Amino acid sequence: MIQVEKAHEPAVATEVAYLPAVAAFKKDYDDEMRVSVVRGDAMTYFRVADHKDRDTHEFFLEFDGKRVTDSNQTLEQLMGRDRRHARFNLIEQITPGDA
């Protein structure tokens, strides 16, 4: 049996912006990395977490102006094979609790 090695793809330069932070989170990821890992790493960097007080606070990633709804997909699945840079926004969604 002959094994064919997958050509090593260059890393995906990933950047996540979050307001009100002044600096973006930047890290290179393999294109097979799941979007959920990028979200988790960015949330750790910005020291934020999903939580509930009177309201429910949830964080999600936005890519190309659209909310990323499937965080189990890889960067390659999200952006395509040849794209080597990803710019996300980390957005906080606040859902009001019962008054």
Please annotate each region the language model reported.
Residues M1-A99:
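Ubiquitin system architectures
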